[in-house]
Amino acid sequence: MGVRFSWGTEVRKLDVEGDKVRGVVTNWERLAADAVVVALGSYSPLLLKRHGIKLPVYPVKGYSLTIPITDASRAPESTIMDETYKIAITRLGDRIRVGGMAEISGYTNDLGPARRRTLEHSVMDLFPGGDAKEASYWSGLRPMTPDGTPVIGPTKIAGLFLNTGHGTLGWTMSSGSARVIADLVSGRKPEIDATDLAVSRYA
């Protein structure tokens, strides 16, 4: 047992024979497996669709700005919400992180200047103790489901499991989701009833 990390590896497709998963095919090799967990966030549906699994997980883009603090007395001490712009502002050591927004624009990670201006305006208006010119600007895709609940559980293909669709709460739900999926893969009964988390709820 144990874990082997494979950096720089791209999963190209699932290896499925009949109604059973046999492993995955990567850009380097074929990896045999008794069970496969698809945990690719917003990209999960792209891997599954060729196998007839319709997964309603959609990419919803969010933006963040990380700003170095130049005046600690004019920086936040704890996390706050700017309800006008629906943006969270928090302190990360000697930096201010401001993030939020929800944009439906497909699988794009482009960084629009208007979004940056909104983030800068929000944080600098409330906490002018940072150097916005030195900020790092980032966007990412949140894997959202229609009902806001993640998809965790088995699929119609034996040995193929899903752990995706956590939306904005990926880190928050990561440990609990990992426990549930580990139990399901191992044939144990999870501590919670996970029936309604499976993709079959959308059938």
From Swiss-Prot:
Q: What's the family?
A: Belongs to the DadA oxidoreductase family.
Cross-referenced Gene3D superfamilies, in alphabetical order? D-Amino Acid Oxidase, subunit A, domain 2 (3.30.9.10), FAD/NAD(P)-binding domain (3.50.50.60)
Q: Which GO terms describe its biological process?
A: D-alanine catabolic process
Q: Which GO terms describe its cellular component?
A: cytoplasm; plasma membrane
Stated EC number for the protein is: 1.-.-.-
Tell me which species this is from.
Sinorhizobium fredii (strain NBRC 101917 / NGR234)
InterPro entries for the chain: FAD-dep_OxRdtase, FAD/NAD-bd_sf
Q: Name one Pfam family in it.
A: DAO
Please provide, alphabetically and separated by semicolons, the GO molecular function terms listed in this UniProt record.
D-amino-acid dehydrogenase activity
Q: What is this protein called?
A: Uncharacterized oxidoreductase y4sL
